[in-house]
């Protein structure tokens, strides 16, 4: 793989993680700003919102707000990761893939496979993070192969 190809892949990975991060930051803020039933209905968009009751116990609101906080910091982390990936950081390439990827594994297993969400935006964001991870691996290992070839 040429250096130009590696750079292009890293730029694409950056754009994917920044989009993913901004969407999750917005979701985090909206989750915290709303009461639990509205927050849950916002995420579980394939479920009839009428099934969510008007109020939940304050502990349920706190739990949902914790989830919103996690979405917010994870989104911020991946946006920052995108900045450092743009600059060629292999460390941030790895950690951004781990943080964003593990987050979406849970979403995929419990929400997508559970049938609680529509394809857009949730499943699309899982595809975005999966694509970023695959392209990260191609850029990293393709670039490593190029370095090995240059030495020999």
Residue ranges and their predicted role:
Residues 2-152:
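Topology signature of small-to-medium multi-pass alpha-helical membrane proteins
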């Amino acid at each position: 793989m040429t250096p130009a190809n590696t750079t292009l892949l890293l730029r694409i990975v950056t754009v994917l993680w920044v989009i993913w991060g901004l969407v999750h930051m917005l979701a985090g803020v909206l989750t915290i700003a709303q009461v639990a039933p509205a927050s849950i209905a916002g995420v579980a968009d394939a479920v009839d919102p009428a099934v969510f009751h008007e109020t939940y116990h304050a502990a349920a609101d706190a739990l949902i707000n914790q989830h919103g906080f996690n979405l917010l910091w994870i989104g911020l982390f991946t946006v920052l990761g995108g900045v450092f990936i743009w600059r060629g950081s292999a460390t941030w390439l790895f950690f951004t893939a781990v943080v964003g990827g593990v987050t979406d594994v849970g979403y995929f297993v419990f929400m997508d496979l559970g049938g609680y969400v529509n394809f857009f935006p949730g499943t699309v964001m899982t595809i975005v993070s999966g694509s970023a991870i695959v392209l990260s691996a191609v850029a990293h290992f393709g670039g490593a192969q190029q370095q090995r070839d240059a030495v020999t």
